[in-house]
């Protein structure tokens, strides 16, 4: 990527350094490249979202891009405190691991017990392998008449961070994603980033019946809206062959979100494989929006 600009401020260099696919930064002077020092933004090693392999895994690079774009759309891009990223359909946790690697707090909600266990087991092994101070506990939270199992991690990226109480949190909730607003009523999230189910083998289920993708969105988006802080942003990727972009946009508008449009927020449609043509949309919860 090449662009003309005035001299970059340290804050601008920091933001560009967080690009999802960056390997090198330089300025061009008299036809020569002068390397720019990249500030280290990582809280954990870059391999965290890469090691766990499974069929259907979303690219960590694409996931980081979604987080970055959502952050730029939100009111929290320049916040100094660690933000929280929620994936309300988290599966085995790629979104969460990308967020944790960058020093954010992360939370995931999913109904799949096996996927959540694999995610938690992997993260615990990762922390132990790297000798990182941490605690892990399994608790249960009650939502109405529903008992929700929760796995909670508190950890630090270094011994010094642990001693200074500069810790991060990672929570996994085994629940129907429609309960998200109840789970986060007291601690709303800054960003929601999720990869919607792609095809019939991943079709959403409501109760004992298979649910259409549009029905799923109409059922859960109001809950996600209420779990998000005013000024927060949502990023969703999906297979356009089973869920057209226009339908996703319409569902977001109906739930109260304000769509992000224009350069940087559109043009993400691309082929992943024969049966998957992926796109992404971005929206915000307006700062003055009403909600629970």
Where are these regions (language model features)?
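Class I S-adenosyl-L-methionine-dependent methyltransferase catalytic core
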Residues: 7-11, 18-20, 27-86, 90-292
């Amino acid at each position: 990527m090449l662009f003309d600009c005035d001299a970059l401020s340290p804050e601008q260099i920091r933001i560009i350094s967080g690009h999802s696919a960056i390997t090198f930064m330089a300025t061009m002077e008299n036809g020569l490249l002068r390397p720019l020092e990249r500030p280290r933004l990582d809280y954990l090693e870059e391999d965290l979202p890469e090691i766990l392999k499974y069929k259907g895994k979303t690219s960590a690079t694409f996931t980081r891009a979604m987080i970055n774009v959502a952050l730029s759309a939100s009111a929290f891009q320049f916040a100094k405190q660690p933000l929280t990223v929620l994936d309300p359909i988290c599966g085995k946790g790629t979104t969460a691991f990308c967020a944790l690697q960058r020093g954010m707090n992360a939370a995931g909600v999913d109904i799949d017990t096996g996927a959540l266990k694999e995610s938690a087991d992997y993260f615990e092994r990762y922390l132990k392998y790297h000798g990182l101070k941490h605690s892990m506990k399994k608790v249960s939270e009650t939502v109405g008449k529903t008992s929700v199992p929760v796995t909670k991690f508190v950890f630090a990226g270094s011994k010094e961070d642990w001693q200074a109480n500069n810790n991060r949190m990672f929570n996994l909730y085994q629940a129907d994603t429609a309960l998200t607003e109840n789970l986060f009523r007291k601690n709303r999230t800054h960003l929601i980033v999720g990869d919607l189910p792609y095809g019939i083998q991943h079709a959403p289920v409501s109760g004992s019946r298979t649910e259409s993708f549009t029905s799923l969105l109409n059922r859960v988006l109001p809950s996600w809206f209420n779990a998000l802080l005013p000024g927060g942003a949502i990023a969703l990727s999906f297979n356009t062959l089973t869920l057209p972009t226009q339908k996703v946009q319409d569902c977001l508008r109906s739930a109260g979100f304000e769509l992000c449009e224009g350069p940087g927020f559109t043009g993400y449609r691309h082929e992943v494989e024969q049966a998957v043509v992926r796109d992404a949309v971005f929206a915000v919860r307006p700062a003055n929006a009403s909600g629970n």
